Amino acid sequence: MSVLFSIKDDFRYDIVRKIFEGGMAVVYEAEQHGAKQFVKRVAIKVIRQSFADQQMFIDNFIGEAKLVADLIHTNIVQTYQFGELNGIYYIVMEYINGVNLEQFAQQMGDKNKKLPSELAVFIASRVCRGLAYAHNKTDKNGKLLGLVHRDVSFKNIM
């Protein structure tokens, strides 16, 4: 048997800190450890404990993981892995260092500054590029997936 068929899911994650709490999940910054002191910074989205036994929320979380798995675009956070451990589902994603748009707007407001219009247009254009890519995404047979982002908000834009 080739080595490729022998590789097992042997990732180890160490939680560094909580990044964000949403309605359905909590996102943590973590370190993924591999062979020879390999370390990669990742984000891990974990279904909230209060929803971990509610099938509707579990199904929604699994559905989200499946939908975003093949979205590969510079303006969309990459998904690396989906898993389950002791009945708790999680999604391992690209870690984006920095603040979200809500935090950035607050920082600007705290300094009595306004977001320059050129920067606002740039941010909006990048958000639109990511949304357009997702909206036009097709399956392997060329059929539109019909993806719609249901939570476009300042806190979900990095």
Where are these regions (language model features)?
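Protein kinase glycine-rich loop
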Residues: 16-23, 27
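Glycine-rich ATP phosphate-binding loop
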Residues: 28-31, 37-48
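AlphaC helix of the eukaryotic protein kinase fold
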Residues: 48-70
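Activation-segment/catalytic-loop signature of the eukaryotic protein kinase fold
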Residues: 82
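Conserved short submotifs of the Hanks-type protein kinase catalytic core
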Residues: 86-100, 104
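AlphaC helix of the protein kinase catalytic domain
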Residues: 101-115
